[in-house]
């Protein structure tokens, strides 16, 4: 027999509990209204942006263009009456133009039609360009409302995380408690309804006393405080820190201005329709994917064995990580990433940063224990082509995904690393090969790689080797090969993409580094040349990564600038590159000769490299023809790097600028980078970024301390 509980609360108590939960729900609805309001503001500002940009273009088209097709339009009469451009004509009606003596109503209509067509075509080609160096009222309005939208969206997400816990039970309790809102309702309710109301009151009181309401109120308080502090400058500053987040939000609201309205990205529609139905969860991914990246993940998951050939800078690594997260959420446990040794550390760091799956390095002295750890626990084994011979996998083990980065490394079918990698691939039903190289330029290489993924398609395209850019060829390889260019998917083209390239030192580099640390005194200049100070740069992990970046840049029609603080480093690099490199720029080169070197570099073909001391070539020179910047070691003052990057990243630059900072893990590079990052974060909390760059540096005393700490670490390691 169930004991009935006695009602120990008043009707006013019940109404109070209901009121508290109703207020929380009311606030949630208000936040949704705020979100909708900010979206409307963004749409309104974007329309103004589109209008102004369109008028700017039309103002540059002289009225003489009306007669390009020899239509008999008397453009001199238009100029006489003050109509000098298409914009002037757009502002007035057909009736106004027809009042000009010598222009009939029919010609006036023709003039307006020509301008209207030009206006429509112009609008279709305009995309939103958010540039910190060229702020307009419209772009500032867009940035401000996007920042506010992000804030309220984050608020709603945080509240929902709390609100969704036991939400159905709570909703039912709130319905049941309404029985106790007043005397007459209680009087005419059944005994069962009264019992449910009593139990519901106790449950809801328990929820409130557990901090449910306080947690939500604290989140709301923090969000309101942030909302009140969001100024134009704050919003722009946040945009520079995380443009991907802003553009991802805008892509959902104004896709026509971001270039996100086209989900096909060059694939046949039959494949697209299937891919778009792919359903998966990205819980555990710690970043926002752009729409084209989400589509890439769909493609990888649906097609199962693919070669992703996106251009450098589009985030192939992020798409691979997101795919592994999606598969982990479907129950997969073991993943493998095979990559060149030069990017192994980078892969481990990216995985740690962007997802909650554990990366396990299977390389170097700990490769055996790392391999066993991965077998036992699962996660993402990150290894090199050379180490794949170690992977003797049990027949029963199936990997969720094998990722092969820089897949052109296995283009030689007779090489050991090719056969070892192919053997690994037999343990997975899903394969992702990645390369930034345009394989259309080397069909034999493409066929060999595709043959591993899909022999049937490889056999089909053998007969099409002479037509790599023909529609039939593209349609044939579409199920297995997918390549997008930046201009295809990033209409806003983020102008500066910065990458930290972490390199793992080999034995000779480590020996040289320890030798430098062991010397008496504070020889920090010698220590800072880590990896570059080996006798032969073929033993340098930084040089190896540098050569890979240069090759990728050449494939994409780019030129490269390399900066180092040290003359010895740039001399070694120049010798290594040979004819690919211009004459070096250092402090002894006269300004006139510097310009002559740069002029020669400007007119050179893709793949050309300019090597310069950062203090000599880092200021006062314009080198817009280069769009890849490599910095050989971290500088002790961020402004030095900023000024160097600005040689290429400036007005007149027509391409994204890709910046690569070459760094060695577990060395002075890591210590300097960490300290500068901390100082920058502290300084940015109280000052603007330009001021921070000029005022932050590591002084000689700090360098001395870093060296002593490195020496202590070396002794402990040995």
Predicted regions: what they are:
Residues 414, 447-450, 456-459, 465-558, ...:
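Interdomain linker/hinge connecting the two RecA-like lobes of the SF2 helicase core
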Residues 329-334, 349, 353-359, 376-377, ...:
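Conserved P-loop NTPase motor "coupling/switch" region that bridges the ATPase
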Residues 29-55, 127, 141-149, 153-171, ...:
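Charged, low-complexity
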Residues 389-393, 441-443, 570-574, 595, ...:
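SF2 helicase motor core recognition
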Residues 71, 101-105:
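Small-residue hinge/turn detector
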Residues 307-314, 319-350, 427-430:
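Conserved SF1/SF2 helicase motif Ia
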Residues 636-645, 649-718:
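A conserved SF2-helicase RecA2
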Residues 367-372, 559-563, 571-572, 579-617:
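Conserved helicase ATPase core of P-loop NTP-dependent helicases/translocases
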